[in-house]
Regions:
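General secretory precursor processing signal
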Residues: 10, 45-46, 68, 148
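Beta-strand-rich domain onsets/edges
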Residues: 1-3
């Protein structure tokens, strides 16, 4: 059986991309009191006979730093570089026998929770969001990239 992937972003930053066991989950704006920040995308495999909870590997691009490049004319341009984070989550079954979605909840400190559900659930954290899809008071400036961050490959 295939389950829809539904993401919930409780961090202060836009998540450019996330995956669940290698399956693309799309992008996620910061959550609002009514929404997790993204829609549903297809799909992650689920075998109903497998013992639960299921261990999942979740990766997301949700941290950023500034990278600078100087061209041959001496002009320097700044670019926002996305940095990948990764966590394991144990997916629990909350579907009441009607599995339709795999929810992935990404919390500010990098903790991830997952659940198999019968459909869309309300966010687990109720956080404010501005009309520009940002957290109120969250600065949108990023630190300069370190050498290690500049070496991080983008999958």
């Amino acid at each position: 059986k295939s389950l829809l992937i539904q993401g919930y972003n409780y961090t202060d930053d836009y998540i450019d991309s996330f995956t669940v066991d290698g399956q693309g989950g799309g992008n996620l704006y910061v959550s609002s009191p009514q929404s997790g920040g993204g829609g549903s995308v297809c799909c992650v495999s689920f075998n109903q006979g497998v013992p639960l909870p299921i261990k999942l590997k979740v990766r997301w691009m949700g941290a950023y730093c500034m990278e600078y490049e100087t061209n041959m004319f001496g002009r320097t341009s700044a670019y926002r570089k996305g940095l990948w984070r990764e966590a394991e989550a144990l997916a629990v079954d909350l579907s009441q026998g009607k599995p339709r979605a795999m929810e992935v909840h990404i919390f500010p400190e990098g903790h991830v929770e997952a659940a198999i559900t019968p459909g869309y659930s309300p966010p687990r954290m109720v956080l404010p969001r501005t009309e520009k899809y940002q957290r109120p008071g969250s600065p949108k400036t990023y630190p300069d990239c370190t050498d290690d961050q500049l070496q991080q490959a983008t999958p």
